[in-house]
């Protein structure tokens, strides 16, 4: 089936677009390709683009919830094939300002850990083998 359009950006509302773009650039790499006071675009090494848009009065989502202030989306990052890779990535994202939301005690049952970025959006570091 032919597509109607091509996805250009995944856009994330936040209180400080420049700070959140810097956080994700440190996590995933890439370069800033557009910068305005209320809008920043980060182009990742694989070509995916993340946009960060100023949202006045921004309230971070609460994870996990299913009501009006619930998570709307989240990003999954491949940290590597081993738990040691995930541990190393976890150390780095925590140093960058992320906050741990859930670390599964049974690594056989789960292959990811859940964090919040500095603006409160949930994201996961995944062990992909």
Show where each model-derived region lies.
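Glyoxalase I/VOC metalloenzyme domain signal
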Residues: 1-8, 12-34, 43-99, 116-129
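Short, small/polar residue-rich loop motifs at catalytic or cofactor-binding pockets
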Residues: 108-110
């Amino acid at each position: 089936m032919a597509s109607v359009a091509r996805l250009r950006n995944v856009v994330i509302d936040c209180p400080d677009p420049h700070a959140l773009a810097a956080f994700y650039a440190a996590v995933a790499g890439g370069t800033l390709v557009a910068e305005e006071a209320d809008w920043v675009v980060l182009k990742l090494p694989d070509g995916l683009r993340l946009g960060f848009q100023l949202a006045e009065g921004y309230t971070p989502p609460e994870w996990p919830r299913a009501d009006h202030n619930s998570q709307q989306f989240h990003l999954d990052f491949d940290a590597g094939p081993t738990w040691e890779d995930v541990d190393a990535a976890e150390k780095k994202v925590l140093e960058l300002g992320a906050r741990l939301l859930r670390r599964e005690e049974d690594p056989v049952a789960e292959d990811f850990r859940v964090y919040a970025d500095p603006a409160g959006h949930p994201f996961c570091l995944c062990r992909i083998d």
